[in-house]
Amino acid sequence: MTDQLITLIWIIIKIVLILVPLLVAVAFITLAERKVIGYMQSRVGPNRVGFRGLAQPIADIFKLLLKEVIIPTASSRYLYLIAPILSLVPALAAWAVIPFAQGWMLANVNAGLLFLFAMTSLGVYGILVAGWASNSKYAFFGALRSAAQVVSYEIPMGFALVGVLLAAGTMNLQGIVLRQSGGLWHWFWLPLLPLFVTYWITAVAETNRAPFDVAEGESEIVAGFHVEYAGVTFALFFLAEYANMVLVSAIATVIFLGGWLSPFQGIPGLESLFAWVPGIVWFVLKLSLFIFTYFWMRATFPRYRYDQIMRLCWKVLIPVTLVWIIILALAIEFHWTHWL
C-alpha cells in the first residue's frame, strides 16, 4: 500500500511539474505574440503593465477571472459550462506522452503516436458543444465550420504521422527521437519534407489559427463559437487554443526535428563544444521556433475563404501525402533506405 501511495504521489508531482510551466508559458506566449506581431507591423505592442509590458499576462488573467460569467437564457446550461473543459482537457492530457528529454516524460507509451493523434482530434467536441449549447446562430455556424475543417485536416495529418511511423518503425515517441540520432541531416524533416510541410499546415488548421481561423471569423460570424462566452469560460477556450498550439509544436519537434537531440551531433568540434547543453534546452528552442512561425503566419497571411481551406486539404495535401507514403513504402520494401 505504501509503495502504491508513493507511486501515486510521484505521478501527481510529475503532472504538476508538466502543467504548471505549460500554463505559465501559455500566459506569456500571448504576450510574445502581441509583441512580435506589433514589431512586424511597426508597433510597440503592450508596454504599460510592468517593465516593457512584461506583466500584461498577469493583468489579463485578473481581468478574465473577475468578469461575470453570463449564461444565455435559452442555452443548455450544463453543456454550455462543460464545453470549455472539453476543449482544454485533451490539450493537457496529450502532454503525458511527450518526451522532453531522455526519460523525461510522464508515461512511456508504446502507442504514443496514436495517443497523440486521438487527443488532438478530441478538442473539436468542445467547440461543437459550445456552438450547440450557446443557442446562437453565429456560434453554431462557427462550430460547424470548425468541425468540418478539423475532420478534413485530420486525414492529411494522419497520413503524415503514418509516414513517420514507416520511417521510424515504432509508435513510441522516445523511440522515434532516438531513430533520428546522428545530427541535423538525420532528422525526419529532410527525408520526409513533404510530410513535414503538410503536418505543419494541418497543425495550424487543426488549432483554428490564422490564416485558417474561419471558425471565429470576426468579420463574418462575430467571433464564432465562443461569441456567447465571457470571463472564466472564455479564458478556458483561450487557454485551450494556446495549449493546443504549444502541443502541436511539441509533436512536430519530437517527430520531425529530433526532439531533445543536439543539431551538432556528428560535427567534430561543435558536438563537444555544445555537449554541456541539456536536452530539454534543445527541445524548448525547437518548440519556440514553431511557436514563432504561428505568430509570423498570423501577421503575414489574410484569412482564407472556407472553400479555399477545403480545396487546399482535399485537392493538395491529401494527394501529396498519399504519394509520399507510397514512395516511402516502396523505398522501405526494396531497402532503398540510405536516405532515411
Swiss-Prot record:
Q: So where does this one cross the membrane?
A: 9-29, 81-101, 113-133, 158-178, 184-204, 221-240, 245-264, 273-293, 316-336
GO biological process terms held by the UniProt record? aerobic respiration
**GO CC annotations on file:** plasma membrane
GO MF annotation terms: NADH dehydrogenase activity; oxidoreductase activity, acting on NAD(P)H, quinone or similar compound as acceptor; quinone binding
UniProt KW Secreted keyword: no
Recorded superkingdom: Bacteria
**What keyword terms does UniProt attach to this protein?**
Cell inner membrane, Cell membrane, Membrane, NAD, Quinone, Translocase, Transmembrane, Transmembrane helix, Ubiquinone
Q: Where in the cell is it found?
A: Cell inner membrane
Sequence similarity: Belongs to the complex I subunit 1 family.
Looking up HAMAP family in the UniProt record yields: NDH1_NuoH
Q: Can you say what this protein is called?
A: NADH-quinone oxidoreductase subunit H
Source organism per UniProt: Coxiella burnetii (strain CbuG_Q212) (Coxiella burnetii (strain Q212))
